[in-house]
Amino acid sequence: VLLEKMAEMLKKRGLSLLITIDEISSTPELREFAGIYQLLLRNNYHIALLMAGLPNKVSELQNDELLTFLLRSQRIYLEPLSLLTIKQSYRRAFNRKGRTIDDDTLNQITKMTNGYAYAFQLLGFLLWRTKETEITSAVVQKILPNYQAELYRNVYIKMYQELSNKDREFIKAMSESGKASVKVAEIAKKMHRDKNYISIYRRRLLDDQLITATKWGEVAFTLPFFADFIKEYQTLY
């Protein structure tokens, strides 16, 4: 009722309302809100909705049987950050404060992010916190365990636990190959299934942006050190 009154006031003044929601999840509250939003649209209020979240959470919300109207909304997939942009950003940040880093080390830390925005921020923070005036490969190796642990704890564990058993089996087969880019045929063989069967899980993991198609018939992890995480998780749990 309050939202409708607000929308009515803005409409009379010739104004529109944009509502933004971050880190969406298919909760009862969000489903209720989405229903109210749909009703406001039907009543021709000038209102728009912008939501952001992990790909699997967005898919879950769009596929809710009560919220199928969301399937008509425009979905924008965020691409990984450009490695060149990451490299330039690191260089500027360190040089601005008089801290040096050679090109080889700069390339090393850039590749360690794999274009993942959170990894870019986290790695930069951990290196900055060392207070070293020269960022060397030795400094990078020193913070590497902490970098991996933070990725695992803050992001990867929750992502992994929300996957289906077959999705887990798929990425486990990928991690066991030891290759950066893995043939789908090899994954199917490890899962003792044909390629048509596992294509469902391949498609789902692609939609969730956990893997990417690197070349015809091959896939790779999108997240840095994700294969290492899977192996460690399997060992510990």
What residue spans do the PLM features occupy?
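C-terminal leucine-rich, beta-strand-based interaction scaffolds used for sensing/assembly
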Residues: 42, 104, 149-237
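Conserved Walker B catalytic segment
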Residues: 1-55, 63-66
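Conserved nucleotide-binding/hydrolysis micro-motifs of P-loop NTPases
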Residues: 26, 54-59, 81-83, 127, ...
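Amphipathic alpha-helical "lid/sensor" segments that cap RecA-like P-loop NTPase cores
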Residues: 91-154
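Short, glycine/charged-enriched secondary-structure capping and boundary segments
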Residues: 32-36, 64-68, 92, 226, ...
